[in-house]
Amino acid sequence: MNNTAFSKLAETTIVYIVDKIEEQDLEGIIDVDLQGDILNLDTENGIYVINTQSASKEIWLSSPVSGPHHFFYEQGKWKSRIGFELMVLLTEELGIRFDKYEIF
């Protein structure tokens, strides 16, 4: 994947995460702050940071629950080297339903 394709895919993914949270978090429990390619989610469990790493073509997640993760895009999914999927992990930790195939 070239840099342009990665940037577009990563941006689409982060915007998708923001949209799903805003759609489902009707009580405003999660404070969403998107600045460029850095997304901060302030939750009852702590602050999540999601950002893109163009050089490695990865999305990085810092979770107050499960720690740091690096995700690469493969076969329609953002996966970590140890087998986690980004959308599945966010669903489990945030309680927001992310259809992992919806944006692809």
UniProtKB/Swiss-Prot annotation:
Keywords: Iron, Metal-binding. One of its GO terms (cellular component) is cytoplasm. One of its GO terms (biological process) is intracellular iron ion homeostasis. One of its GO terms (molecular function) is 2 iron, 2 sulfur cluster binding. The keyword Metal-binding applies. It holds the Pfam family Frataxin_Cyay. PROSITE patterns: FRATAXIN_1, FRATAXIN_2. InterPro entries: CyaY (IPR047584), Frataxin/CyaY (IPR002908), Frataxin/CyaY_sf (IPR036524), Frataxin_CS (IPR020895). The keyword Metal-binding applies. NCBIfam families: FeS_CyaY (TIGR03421). Involved in iron-sulfur (Fe-S) cluster assembly. May act as a regulator of Fe-S biogenesis. Belongs to the frataxin family. This is Iron-sulfur cluster assembly protein CyaY.
